Amino acid sequence: MTEAIRPMPEEMPVELWRGVKPSSPAWQGRVVSLFVAPKSAEEMVSLSNVRAMADRGLEGDRFFRDSWNAINRSDKAVSLIEDEVLELAAAELGVESIAQKSRRNIVTRGVPLIDLLHREFVVGNVRMRGIRLFEPCPHLVKVSKLPGIFKALNHRSGLKAAILSDGIIRVGDSIALQVNPAVATA
């Protein structure tokens, strides 16, 4: 039986979110994996670090501004997903890991992504702003070749974020809310 895939709205309603719930206002998060894909249908490549460029994206990624498929798509700067969600989804699918197949750039641990929605935060020394929660898309199912991935990631497929400052993001970097963005930019 094939998986029923329906088009998803541009922005997922917050009340449908099935990702990590905030357990305390003092969570401590970090980057556990980094991925880019040079082209839309190519496999994600695991990296130990990646250059983030404000208003452009991650160097080497398919959505890096000025690449053929990122023109006029400012909401495609970077994607984040919770490692805790990936572990649950992998267990549901009966596989060891789906981090690379999730097609997300930054895999986080200890970060309730819903806390970053419409807020500024830092990954290492790179400032970002959470733009929207999102759903898996039919392209993910096609490229991942993993039956059931759409359902496993439904309502918990991650966060799109805009990159606000240049810098290098590394595996192991901390992730924190930007307490006072005005002070950081002064």
List the predicted regions and their residue ranges.
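Metal-cofactor-dependent catalytic cores
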Residues: 1-186
